[in-house]
Amino acid sequence: MSRSEALFAQAQKHIPGGVNSPVRAFKSVGGTPLFFKHAEGAYVIDEDDKRYVDYVGSWGPMILGHGHPEVLDAVRNQLQHGLSYGAPTAMETEMADLVCSIVPSMEMVRMVSSGTEATMSAIRLARGYTGRDAIIKFEGCYHGHSDSLLVKAGSGLLTQGVPSSAGVPADFAKHTLTLPFNDIAAVEKTLAEVGQTVACIIVEPVAGNMNCVPPAPGFLEGLREQCDKHGVVLIFDEVMTGFRVSLGGAQGYYGITPDLSTFGKIVGGGMPVGCFGGKREIMGCIAPLGPVYQAGTLSGNPLAMAAGLTTLKLISRPGFHDELTAFTSRMLDGLQQRADAAGVPFVTTQAGAMFGLYFSGADDIVTFDDVMASDAERFKRFFHLMLEGGVYLAPSAFEAGFTSIAHGDKELQITLDAAERAFAKLK
């Protein structure tokens, strides 16, 4: 029995499902989840001392690679001064100044402790600002596990939301409308009928929880136009895309300005951090300035601020994102070439240093239906074949992949060699 198998058996005694986040259980790909004990650069090392080129990156935060020395030094330095104060610090102000300078739409920002907390707070703020209750989200987009967002609508565009998780009251979920991603006509129709009741539209500008689906031409522009027309707050959930697809996130990459934005992952440098912010007029509704309450014991935690500040400064250097995007493109091109040579139907998608892999014969992946039509069973086999070859991908056909600046030519060759062997077995 491997160490991971033994640890998983032990974990299941007192941890539901043996994991603290469902995707880690390998339910989507089968087998025993790997337990990691160390990570360095572009690699993760499991409890049996096997090394893997890592394309999960803790689900996005590790854009510098694991254990970057300057980030570790910043955290060590802060450790000498205490773990948490529950009071304002200079680093919080420095972080706010830096985030607002990087992302022009962020006129004010509030730090929180997770991406879920950021999206939950942004929606509450939009409701408080507009005095409206309904929200619009998109099929296949995940915005954390708060009650109002664990909803998927029925087949009609205006079908009231029904919970997709037990424990979410139907009366609460009914305020959430779910529309098809990349379908601006559905948005126009919905807002024409019920726009006066809608507080906000929240969207992943690149849908990262149905693998990686970039916005169709005109989709984000259409959202901005429709929100302006109907007085609806436009929220970009940039928990995944922020500081990754470009320094200024997806809004910088695509040139669209939201009213509010949420961030997580990279902004904490690997620590549990999120933030939300946007227009000063809207942010002025947050307590203690306004009537919308939001608070958190560990918000602005100094250890997290030290890691996040250092990370944001390092990725702000000229050329950083160009280099990272170029590596990602080379890797995806290499995978596509090898799949084509093996005669395996395969499509890749990319937004900066974020990517998607689909076993599909489609020309492109644009909609939720395109994603669901891909071959998840073939992905399962591919995932395990890549593991055998020393490459760790997201253990789900519906999760995005991430590269880091620590990935280089050596890691690229390991990846492409493993993929060539895998595709040959998938014919």
Curated annotation (Swiss-Prot):
Enzyme nomenclature, EC number: 5.4.3.8
Cofactor section: pyridoxal 5'-phosphate
Modification N6-(pyridoxal phosphate)lysine, positions: 265
Domain of life: Bacteria
Biological processes, Gene Ontology terms: protoporphyrinogen IX biosynthetic process
Enzyme class at the top of the EC tree: isomerase
Catalysed reactions listed for this entry: (S)-4-amino-5-oxopentanoate = 5-aminolevulinate
A GO CC term assigned to this protein in UniProt: cytoplasm
UniProt entry keywords in alphabetical sequence: Cytoplasm, Isomerase, Porphyrin biosynthesis, Pyridoxal phosphate
Annotated signal sequence range: none
PROSITE patterns: AA_TRANSFER_CLASS_3 (PS00600)
Subcellular location: Cytoplasm
Statement: the UniProt record of this protein carries the keyword Glycoprotein: no
Pathway: Porphyrin-containing compound metabolism; protoporphyrin-IX biosynthesis; 5-aminolevulinate from L-glutamyl-tRNA(Glu): step 2/2
Family: Belongs to the class-III pyridoxal-phosphate-dependent aminotransferase family. HemL subfamily.
NCBIfam families: hemL, PRK00062.1
Subunit structure and binding partners: Homodimer.
UniProt name for this protein: Glutamate-1-semialdehyde 2,1-aminomutase
Species name: Pseudomonas entomophila (strain L48)
Gene: hemL
